[in-house]
């Protein structure tokens, strides 16, 4: 059994990552009350900030990784971007529910013809011997015209993101989503690396 520490407290991300990695011999450990300010200007910088913070907390003696992801919309100058999680406070200086944040995006995109957008996921890994590696995944699509009120799956902006198959991410099961999503792509790359390195020793 190998142990790997994940610098997050986001339950939705944890569930997706466990499903994608699907490694019975991997003990994925999530720290309690882990909180760090995302001061980076890119997804890569933020994922590395998280990984470095957890690496330090664990006395630089464990394999760790951080992840940062978000939605980038062409017509909004690639916003919400790195502010995806906190776009409500960034844009309106107040907290909104998930549906309200989605509606905020739709309102900003009202009458906008260019609806191209993409989700990006960036992973930063730090090994016990201080090796730093980065993995990234992107899924391109469009912003829908309306909210998916009867969504069955997903979280965050999934209910307003249309894939190339004209399906919203929130219409897909977790398994279906993880085959094509930004997180699925990035963590599939990460899994290949882990199988070759961590589980080959």
From Swiss-Prot:
One GO location term (cellular component): cytosol
InterPro entries registered for this protein in UniProt: dITP/XTP_pyrophosphatase (IPR020922), ITPase-like_fam (IPR029001), RdgB/HAM1 (IPR002637)
Pfam families: Ham1p_like
Protein name in UniProt: dITP/XTP pyrophosphatase
Residues noted as binding substrate in the record, renumbered to the chain: 8-13, 69, 155-158, 177, 182-183
Active-site feature positions: 68 (proton acceptor)
EC number(s) on file: 3.6.1.66
Binding site for Mg(2+): 68
Cofactor: Mg(2+)
Provenance organism: Borrelia garinii subsp. bavariensis (strain ATCC BAA-2496 / DSM 23469 / PBi)
A GO MF label: XTP diphosphatase activity
